[in-house]
């Protein structure tokens, strides 16, 4: 599997992994390529897989009283692990939907196989706690930006950190993620 090496690099940065763990993990991974926009998880479902983004973009959609289609509450990029927050690790019904954009390549691990890895390998639980911590820290930083930054600064910063999102995602998805009205994001993008 050509993308397994990328997964191992990311895992090893989170926690040193043993050769035995690597051998146990490899046959459990399934590669998925997204051809069209794909809803991977619906609100109320229990997520049965965790995904690793090899390339492409995945978004989280939260219910919103002000829009029928919901709002983009999170993006996952290449090198990220995709899981419903909260809910996945507790096995609870998801409060969000997860959607992958066309061209996204994912590696998938079932919830059951993940549980066995956590149970049988010391690094399994360390990896999970590190993933949860990093996810929560990134979400907290984003919430802080939404509260503390002006829209123009937030768009500028996000554009420079994640240009690929602007080539892949719909403007309305980016706008809702940044807390901006759909039609307002274009004026902030001028001059970038």
Which residue stretches match the model-derived regions?
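Residues that scaffold the ATP/ADP-binding catalytic core of kinase and kinase-like folds
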Residues: 61, 84-85, 116-117, 158, ...
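Cyclic nucleotide-binding regulatory module and flanking cytosolic helices
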Residues: 1-30, 87
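Cyclic-nucleotide recognition modules
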Residues: 71-130
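Glycine- and acidic-residue-biased ligand/ion/polar-headgroup-sensing regions
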Residues: 48-63, 79
């Amino acid at each position: 599997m050509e993308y397994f090496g990328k997964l191992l690099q990311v895992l090893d940065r989170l926690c040193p992994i043993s050769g035995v763990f690597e051998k146990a993990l490899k046959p459990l991974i399934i590669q998925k390529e997204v051809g069209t926009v794909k809803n991977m998880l619906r609100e109320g479902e229990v997520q049965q897989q965790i995904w690793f983004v090899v390339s492409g973009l995945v978004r989280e959609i939260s219910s919103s009283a002000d829009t029928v289609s919901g709002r983009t509450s999170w993006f996952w990029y290449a090198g990220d692990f995709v899981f419903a927050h909260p809910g996945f690790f507790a096995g609870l019904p998801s409060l969000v939907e997860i959607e992958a954009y066309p061209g996204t390549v994912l590696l998938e691990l079932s919830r059951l196989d993940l549980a066995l890895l956590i149970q049988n390998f010391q690094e399994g639980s360390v990896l999970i706690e590190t993933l949860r911590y990093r996810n929560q820290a990134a979400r907290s930083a984003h919430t802080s930006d939404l509260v503390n930054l002006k829209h123009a600064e937030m768009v500028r910063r996000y554009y420079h950190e994640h240009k690929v999102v602007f080539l892949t995602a719909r403007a309305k998805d980016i706008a809702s993620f940044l807390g901006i009205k759909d039609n307002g994001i274009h004026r902030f993008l001028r001059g970038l």
